[in-house]
Design a protein with these regions (language model features):
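Metal-dependent nuclease catalytic cores that hydrolyze phosphodiester bonds in DNA/RNA
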Residues: 1-114, 245-283
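Cys/His-rich finger/ribbon microdomains and the adjacent scaffold used
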Residues: 2, 8, 37-39, 45, ...
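A residue-level signal for conserved active-site and pocket-lining positions in enzyme catalytic cores
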Residues: 15, 108, 140, 221, ...
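Flexible loop/turn segments at secondary-structure boundaries
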Residues: 28, 127-128, 163-164, 258-259, ...
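Conserved DEDDh/DEDDy metal-dependent 3′-5′ exonuclease domain
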Residues: 89-97, 103-107, 118-121, 133-198, ...
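Conserved RNase H-like, two-metal-ion catalytic cores of nucleic-acid enzymes
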Residues: 97, 289-368, 389
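Short beta-strand-loop-alpha-helix junction that forms the active-site gateway
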Residues: 121-129
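Acidic, Mg2+-coordinating catalytic module of metal-dependent nucleases/exonucleases
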Residues: 162-234, 254, 431-503
Length: 503
């Protein structure tokens, strides 16, 4: 039987079935790109944390499985770890231990006068998931204790969200070290029983389990699509606008799963509109509401969209962990009624801090006191506020832009225009294909270059700095095309609103 790793143990704690599927049906895993990006950032943080206590020995060892793939060589890692312990090494990174089919690699094993302390590294900035972290570390302590290691302390290393890059990067200032011994002590007695249960379950057939809160708590399960297949129809109660997952589960467990089942339930106005339009396969248009919204727009009219990067490790002076750094914008505009649609844009180089140049060009491209639209303007307004704070000399103009932004999301969120294809979402990625189902020009899936959503843009931009000239050129084009489509989409939505209000 395969070894039970700490990640598998944590999966078992959330849902035993998920562990079985991870072991025997990994092809069913579906991971959101943003979740994968968080995993990747966690790896970066782990590498950085190894420097916390000075010199260290790295136990990580790989074995080549074919020309392109590698996997961890667990046996070699445990041998290297034991050698480092015998030599009195003070810090061992990824210290590996194997006991009775249970395997773990400790992020940092730090020598103390009486034994060793476990330091578990997380890319979080708070302790909101302390119960899960304690399960993780308790499992490690269990394995180490059974390997004869005297564990003298258990600590969680996470990110200080108040850290600001000022001069040289300070690895000690970047991290917080938290003593979680009490939380680990509370979890420790549960480990042997859970380990036995997990091993027994893995020896059997696929377990049966109902959908529950654990499907998304504490983490989104990558097997949701697999487990809900054949159980949850489309559309369903899970698609109702702003209905919590917990509430949707309650309805499902009481026998209400389809929208038809929800006819006699108390719903919000928007949910009721969604239900009626979907079941009746009809479009709802409130012309008066749309006309009232359109009176808020005036020429010259600008359509603005930002893209940001959000790195866990600050890259630019004055920034903090996970700060949204605006690196790109697209701007379509029409100067007067019947005027030509024009476009301008900005994109950083991926190497230097793009914010000052972006802010300067934005102030040049958008005059004072003009009407600008954004889709879900809270995002753009927050970025503008941050730019104004970073560059006080540009602040008056930037704040003026912010104060004249009208949200193009408003008429859709208000329910003035609804089509069944929106499926309870007013995201531009849902609204656009619902209103223009046959317009290939507006289909994000037709974009080439690997950038078809904001998450992909966020992930690929930081990589530009290390790309070849040809790769950078291709990526730059892909980013420009994607962001341009966002603002073109806004123009098309505005035109559609004008058209239906006049029909």
């Amino acid at each position: 039987m395969p070894n039970l790793s700490k990640s598998k143990y944590i999966t078992f704690c959330q849902c035993p079935k998920a562990l079985w599927l991870k072991q025997y049906k990994p092809e069913e895993i579906v991971i959101d790109p943003l979740v994968q990006a968080r995993f990747d950032s966690g790896t970066q943080v782990g590498e950085l944390a190894k420097r916390l206590f000075g010199d260290f020995v790295e136990a990580t060892t790989y074995i080549q499985t074919d020309d392109t793939a590698q996997r961890l060589d667990l046996r070699a890692m445990t041998v290297l770890t034991q050698k480092a312990i015998a030599e009195g090494v003070e810090n061992i990174a990824e210290a590996a231990f194997l006991y009775g089919g249970c395997y773990c690699a400790v992020d940092i094993l730090h020598k103390t006068p009486q034994g060793y302390a476990i330091y578990e590294v997380k890319s979080s900035t708070d302790l909101s998931q302390l119960d899960v972290y304690a399960q993780d570390v308790a499992y490690q302590k269990y394995v180490l204790a059974n390997c004869g290691i005297n564990v003298t302390g258990t600590y969680l290393v996470n990110i200080d969200n108040e850290y600001v890059l000022d001069g040289e990067f300070d690895v000690k200032g970047f991290f917080n070290i938290n003593d979680i011994s009490q939380a680990v002590a509370n979890e420790y007695p549960k480990v042997p029983g859970r380990v036995a249960q997990a091993k027994k379950m893995l020896e059997g057939n696929e377990p049966q389990r109902d959908l529950g809160e654990y499907c998304h708590k504490p983490y989104d399960c990558p097997f949701w699509e697999y487990c809900s297949r054949g159980i949850v129809p489309h559309p369903s109660v899970f698609d109702l606008y702003r209905m919590s997952f917990k509430k949707s589960l309650e309805h499902m467990h009481e026998g209400r799963i389809t929208l038809e089942d929800m006819r006699n339930e108390k719903l919000s106005d928007t949910q009721q509109l969604q239900l009626e339009c979907t079941l009746g396969n009809k479009t709802y248009i409130n012309k008066d509401g749309i006309k009232e919204f359109l009176t808020k727009l005036s020429y010259p009219l600008y359509f603005l969209d930002f893209e940001t990067e959000q790195t866990v490790i600050p890259k630019y002076q004055g920034t903090h962990p996970y700060q949204q750094v605006t690196f790109q914008y697209s701007l379509h505009y029409i100067e007067h009624e019947g005027g030509e649609l024009k476009h301008t844009e900005f994109l950083g180089d991926g190497k230097t801090d793009p914010r000052r140049a972006l802010a300067e060009q934005l102030c040049h491209d958008i005059p004072l006191n003009v009407c600008t639209t954004a889709y879900n303007k809270a995002f753009e307004c927050t970025r503008l506020k941050e730019l104004a704070e970073a560059y006080p000399d540009l602040a008056p103009h930037i704040i003026n832009i912010r104060d004249h932004i009208v949200d193009l999301l408003d008429p859709f969120r208000a329910g003035y225009y609804y089509k069944p294809a929106m499926n309870g979402s007013f995201s531009i990625k849902k609204v656009l294909p619902a209103l223009f189902p046959d317009d290939l020009q507006l289909d994000y899936h037709n974009l080439s270059g690997g950038v078809q959503n904001g998450g992909e843009a966020m992930n690929i931009y930081p990589l530009m700095a290390s790309m070849t000239v040809e790769e950078r050129k291709k990526t730059r084009r892909a980013l420009l095309d994607y962001c341009c489509l966002d603002t073109l989409a806004m123009v098309k939505l505005w035109e559609k609103l004008r058209k239906v209000s006049e029909e």
